Amino acid sequence: MKKEVIAHKNPKSPISEVFRTLRTNIQFMNVSKKMKTLLVTSTFPSEGKSWVASNLAVTFAQAGKKVVLIDADMRKGRQYAIFGLSPKPGLSNFLSQVEIGNDGRLSEDVGNFIQATEVENLYVMTAGNVPPNPSELLVSAQMIGLIDSLKKVCDMIIIDGTPSELVTDSVILSRIADSTLIVTAHKITKKDALERVVKNIRNVGGNIAGVVINKVPVSAKKYGERYYYYGEDKILSGKSKKEANINKKQTSAGNFSFEDRLSNEGTYQNKMEQMEEDNFLRNDDEPFWVPEQQNEGENTSNEEILSDKT
């Protein structure tokens, strides 16, 4: 497992606490309707989408929730590398192989396509093989059947989607998910791009939980200027004075079924070789949460926080 999974590698770090705050606020967003599926998307690549999804999934699992993290970026999925798992079988294999009977039952056990992680309660469905038609697979009955099946045995399903400005996959998934979290990057994400993503999701009937603003400069007075990297993505996150008033909301195992594995979970032994970890996030990295509806009296706008470039 890569060190960018800060919530697991260093659960007492400030960044882990930020993700726990995000988890708590997501849980209490709508107490009348329990959220069980959350889609995480971005506008473009390198905004920290997969990093947010993986750490958020870990914090839900740490709270005792049975969590499945689905890597729905079938073009360029990263979750298998983040957690040190086999890249396949995964989502694309499930959607292309499994059939649904007239009674709604799946022809194969979902657990055959899901892998346990070294984090207790957390399972990952990797993206699988790169299919020729990812968008078509996501609108299939198999995708609906997958989510319905997982809802019966899991407390939380987090879907790591694609960048919404590049392909329509995440917009499609926003109709299935209970709500969508949009990850943006300070001084990188363009305002018009974010507006298009929000509009497209709403046009198909999707709900938006809010926006996480990533790569925000850390206050030099409070923490000192720091830049962090992992893989090819430069991550610069933290809390600046301008954002101070924003609310932070935040493998198949044997011959028994996935449902049985959830109720009889044992100690996971990681047999994968340690993957190369060139660079990683520092422990005190902090993303920000901008709720979909801000409280009255707040005058900090997305325009101030995101890129001032057009």
Predicted regions and their residues:
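P-loop NTP-binding module
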Residues: M1-T310
